[in-house]
């Protein structure tokens, strides 16, 4: 099995897992009672509000798992002397975050033409921002800069409800599609 097949297998496993999770969330969700203590200040999303952030983080973890391996794959395949780790040490070369650093390594060192994959890269970068809010702020945008909060509000399939990031099923599926497309393009380059 080659690296592209491994990625395809992981994506299909994730699709199956997400399908089951969403079915569980739908079956388990219920509308909160209006008589409940605290009433309307709580979000009426049921269990799905916990499932979707988990799924978004899983999609980004898939990308974050495979990109360093793809960098190593292309380093070995191209007999490149500069490793990803060495590239990361040079502050003038690396990106503002790991995702940008991987992309720069693949395009500048491994010389892959990823121009056609820029729409997927941008969607993965959006996913990275959303994932960071889930992981580092519990989904709350109160402490984010206005610029980051506005960026998140403009993302398709993402909304803010009472200063909490909410993602749709469509956001999850499209993020997984873009992750798969981007990783497959790199694996097959």
Annotate the PLM regions:
Residues 1-79, 110-125, 129, 145-189:
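Extended intrinsically disordered or low-complexity regions, especially N/C-terminal cytosolic tails and loops
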Residues 82-132:
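A contiguous pocket-lining binding segment that forms or flanks enzyme active sites
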Residues 135-149:
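Short conserved catalytic/interaction loops centered on acidic-Pro-aromatic/His motifs
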């Amino acid at each position: 099995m080659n690296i592209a097949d491994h990625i395809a297998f992981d994506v299909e496993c994730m699709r199956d897992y997400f399908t089951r999770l969403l079915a569980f969330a739908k079956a388990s969700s219920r509308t909160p009672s209006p008589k409940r203590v605290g009433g309307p200040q709580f979000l009426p999303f049921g269990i799905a509000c916990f499932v979707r952030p988990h799924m978004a983080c899983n999609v980004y973890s898939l990308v974050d798992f495979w990109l360093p391996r793809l960098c190593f794959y292309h380093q070995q395949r191209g007999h490149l002397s500069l490793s990803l780790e060495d590239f990361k040490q040079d502050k003038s070369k690396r990106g503002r975050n790991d995702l940008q650093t991987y992309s720069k390594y693949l395009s500048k060192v491994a010389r892959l033409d990823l121009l056609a994959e820029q729409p997927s890269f941008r969607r993965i970068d959006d996913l990275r921002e959303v994932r960071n809010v889930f992981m580092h702020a519990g989904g709350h945008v109160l402490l984010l800069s206005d610029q980051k909060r506005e960026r998140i509000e403009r993302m398709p399939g993402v909304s803010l409800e009472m200063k909490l990031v909410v993602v749709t099923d469509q956001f999850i599926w499209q993020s997984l599609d873009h992750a798969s497309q981007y990783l497959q393009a790199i694996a097959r380059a």
